[in-house]
């Protein structure tokens, strides 16, 4: 935005030397010189780019210098090409007044902010009418630029066209706002520039600002609505380069600022804020340049696979607690946070300047709208403001108070007060942190009844949150380098608090009926909000964040004003905040031992209520799509079973009673087909009746009866299960070894992901296997053609029509970026988690063929799978199998477990994937 001096320019490109070489070729070869001229130009371009690439490696954060260097390189080439075209290709001895051209740089090129693969945006300006000469010169120049490999955005206009189109189109107006003269007729450019300011800009300032801000808001919404998405768009994302450019455009439009430095003279930024502006801009420009260098294309998305490479290129080193890529991304998010803060300050100053102008000149000149006072603060226009510049310095506790009052009264924070809070946040020392009044105010804010999420986000933006709670400051802008978490830790935490507030107000009753009901039964709502705040507080410290976080909770809770019982409960919740989701998603909830072990840890209804609520908001806050009806179903089943055990001290019904009750429910569900229960019910073992819900059992019995009536050896049925948010796939076949892994392979080949599997064998030797299946983005299959494809793929797999494993290996990963992560497979055996089965948990890189391979490895080692529970955490899968040996007994022999473990590790390894993939 400022035009930095490009050092050692001739090492990038020596225009005079290049022009002389082109001139000599033109003199020697005449009309046939074009190939030779193009070769010389291309060599100059490649040499210049090589020089700038090396400079970027030598000074990896010099974003301004590198982008200005690329613009300088293009400038010189354009000038040489223009001179060559007008001197040798289309010379005119006595040009008329119409035979004039000015070449202008617009867009990023006009700002002298060009990344290595940026488009070259050029405007050709000519007088009132286009002559053949103007058209010939324009066309010849464009062909040279295209042949050099540039992607050119071009326009050809008269000053009259420019004025008319700029009035009508915001994009054109913005492009011309930053147009820069490159070569040609300077007088023509000056004339057009003068007309632009007098005929386009004057009187449209407020309209331009409003349209630019609306454009920005729409862009933010497209890009994810937050600056803390862990794969940000460096250019278009919130807090990115486009936001900085928007500030510059507005400042230039209103104040005719020629560079970002002049925003200080206009009173829109302080010197300190301007330096923050430049630092953030330079860093983001550098990141964009590295992206272009790595990819060889105009890439602006900072995806996981590029983050590691750029962290290395920009010389971020690993530290004991954080990897290099996490340190790089934390610095990135701190810069975009600074951009957000600058945006607020800038727009507040702009708004104030407009307001002063209206007051001086408008119909209401001399009229002062009424403000009111609230505990010493000024409230005006729905905003709360500090009444003076020393307000926070006189009493730093007010730095917390202003946010609490805003939350309690439904007010916004005046941006000028945000600026003061940002400046004065350094006043928060131990004396303020340990002040009982400050902590009571903070707790009131955290547990606010209106919108604590927004107020806490403002507090975080101003730097006050991290200063008052230093442990929270440690996770500020900290990313989690995985594909599961969508946001930085601080943003995830604030979102979790927001979801908790919504649940308490009943706004999420449909998705979270139990949490909505139970939150009003807890003894201390403060515990719920403090636990949400602290559940991830110790991430990034190099150890188990649950254990370390519980220790932090034991220190912080008394400071916040919680009593001993509340402190103990918060510490336990932080320690066990993953217990409920892990149990629900990785364990068989129909196994009594699962409930027994869970209840032994939870111990009380109060703990259960709080844990269920915390689990729900934690999953919701991970990111869009992480909460679904299937997870809700699992958590609900676990909650209900644990609640019954805790309330009664035991399960309400013993095994035989539960089976009898289930049969009665199935009889009712079958209705007119109840006779089928008598016909086939005795063939189904007790384990089947306990494991399956009555609606699934009734479907299974009808399907089994039809298959037997028509003597069908294989029956496959798929249907959408709305309650579980998945597709129920039932396979009934003569039981034989290897059936499970073949069915799994068929489902995956049809594009499905298995999220749960229950494998049963009737007393007469038929397999009844139920699978819950979703598509790669967590949605059920519901269309007839999709269901038919799954059924056909399973039939083909069971019939062994074609080699299954190579086909699966060729299927692309649903998320190819998974290769950016180091996921080492791990296999755990647990003979205590179930009374009847050995539980095997496999953690590995998620891929389409994984479950099929694991199932085959178990089959080849004579292991019988009774149920499987599949959970995906971004790039990582956790597959849990309840198994026995061929006799139906647990697997307890150490050497046998070692053999099975190695087979599973081999099946899940990247090396095995590489063997199967085509060369």
Swiss-Prot record:
Q: Which SMART domains match?
A: HDc (SM00471)
Annotated region described as Uridylyl-removing, given as residue ranges? 374-727
Please list the cofactors this protein needs: Mg(2+)
**GO molecular function annotation:** [protein-PII] uridylyltransferase activity; phosphoric diester hydrolase activity
Question: Which top-level group of life is the source organism from?
Answer: Bacteria
The EC number on file is 2.7.7.59, 3.1.4.-
Spell out the protein name for this chain: Bifunctional uridylyltransferase/uridylyl-removing enzyme
Enumerate the residue ranges of region (Uridylyltransferase): 1-373
* Gene label: glnD
Q: Which InterPro entries match?
A: ACT-like_dom_sf, ACT_dom, GlnD_Uridyltrans_N, HD/PDEase_dom, HD_domain, NT_sf, PII_UdlTrfase/GS_AdlTrfase, UTase/UR
Report activity regulation: Uridylyltransferase (UTase) activity is inhibited by glutamine, while glutamine activates uridylyl-removing (UR) activity.
The UniProt similarity line reads:
Belongs to the GlnD family.
Role this protein plays: Modifies, by uridylylation and deuridylylation, the PII regulatory proteins (GlnB and homologs), in response to the nitrogen status of the cell that GlnD senses through the glutamine level. Under low glutamine levels, catalyzes the conversion of the PII proteins and UTP to PII-UMP and PPi, while under higher glutamine levels, GlnD hydrolyzes PII-UMP to PII and UMP (deuridylylation). Thus, controls uridylylation state and activity of the PII proteins, and plays an important role in the regulation of nitrogen assimilation and metabolism.
What residues does the HD domain cover? 489-611
GO BP terms, alphabetized: regulation of nitrogen utilization
In terms of Pfam families, this protein maps to: DUF294, GlnD_UR_UTase, HD
